[in-house]
Amino acid sequence: NPANPRYINAVEIYVRDLFTRIGNSSALCDVVIYNEPVYNASVHESCNPMWQNFLQNKYKDISAVNTAYGANYGSFEEISMPKEVSGEKIFGDYMQFNDEIMSELHHTVSEYIGKYTKAFRHTKVMQYIRPYVGGERLNKSNNYELWANAFDVNGCDAFSAQAQEEHIPLYAKAAWYDYMR
C-alpha cells in the first residue's frame, strides 16, 4: 500500500541509503523511479478510511453523496470502494482517489531522490496508452497528467506505439510526444 506511512518511510530510508552512496557518481545520468507503475487501492481494506475521508472532503455531507450516487448511505463509513470497473459515479470518484494516491507517491519519491542527486528523474509509463489495454487506465491509477511535474522528463517508452502494431491509430502514436516536457 503506497499510502501507508511505513511504506513511505521505508522508501525514504532506501533512497537516502542508496543515493548517498551513488548520487554524485559521474556514471549516474538518470533515475527511473518506476517501471509501469500501477496501483489498485480497492484490494486493500486498509485504504477504506482514506477513501471515506476523500469522499467526505469532496462531498462534505452524506446527503450530497446519496444524491450523486442515487444511494441511501447513512454515513461515509458505510461506503466501500468499488471492486469492479463500472460507469457509475462512485467508480469515477474511486478513480480520482486511486490516481491521487499514486500521484502523491511519485511526487514524494521524486522529491526524496532530488535531495541526493542531480540525475534526471523519470518514470516509464507508456505501456498503458495503447488503445486495446485502455481498461488498464480505469483501475490501475495511471493518470500520467497528475504525475508529469514530478519528473524531469516524461514519456520515452514508445515501443508499443511506434513499431509494434500497424493497426494503432495516429493519436496513439502521437501520444508519446504529449507526455514529454
What are these regions (language model features)?
Residues 1-173:
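Polysaccharide-binding and catalytic clefts of secreted carbohydrate-active enzymes
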